[in-house]
């Protein structure tokens, strides 16, 4: 009986750690693979780097922001409202559909990066970056959950990036 209770408690604690680890971008950055540590500044500036380590890191970040589903595919509904709040344009729905559409054929570990990369190459890229930055700041507790994109987002991101990109 004790073993069963202990096993259930251990599994529950493990799941809580996994869920909590995916709440903030900062937590993903603390666990970034060694190969990417010297490139973190570039990554934060939305430069696309290729490789399994980058895919793993972006998967963590996109999950932390809630921009992908548990299977790594893009979450249309999590992004359409923030994108349109920044710049109301029908292109966002089209780009989210396009970027999310063909990713199901990829292995789960590659989906989030493929979606991220596609969005950064789309006509919604600027709005995507702004929504990404805003959500990062909200999740980090630096802005309220009801915050809208404003110049304050740029200021706060510049401060964070300034500490990382020395």
Swiss-Prot record:
One Pfam family of this chain: PBP_GOBP
Location of this chain's protein in the cell: Secreted
UniProt GO molecular function: odorant binding; protein sequestering activity; toxin activity
A GO BP entry: suppression of blood coagulation in another organism
Control of this protein's activity: Zn(2+) modulates binding to host coagulation factor XII (F12) and high molecular weight kininogen (KNG1).
InterPro entries from the UniProt entry: PBP/GOBP (IPR006170), PBP_GOBP_sf (IPR036728)
Family indicated by similarity: Belongs to the PBP/GOBP family.
Name of the protein: Short form salivary protein D7R1
């Amino acid at each position: 009986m004790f073993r069963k209770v202990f096993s259930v408690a251990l599994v529950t604690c493990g799941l809580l750690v996994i869920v909590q680890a995916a709440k903030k971008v900062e937590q993903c950055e603390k666990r970034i693979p060694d190969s990417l540590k010297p490139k973190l500044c570039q990554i934060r500036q939305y430069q696309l780097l290729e490789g399994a380590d980058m895919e793993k890191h972006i998967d963590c970040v996109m999950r932390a922001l809630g921009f992908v589903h548990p299977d790594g595919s893009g979450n249309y509904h999590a992004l359409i409202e923030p994108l349109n709040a920044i710049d109301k344009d029908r292109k966002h729905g089209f780009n989210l559909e396009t970027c999310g559409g063909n990713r199901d054929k990829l292995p789960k570990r590659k989906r989030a990066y493929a979606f991220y990369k596609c969005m950064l190459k789309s006509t919604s890229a600027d709005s995507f970056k702004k929504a990404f930055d805003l959500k990062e700041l909200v999740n980090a507790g630096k802005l309220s959950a009801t915050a809208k994109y404003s110049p304050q987002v740029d200021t706060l991101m510049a401060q964070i990036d300034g500490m990382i990109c020395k």
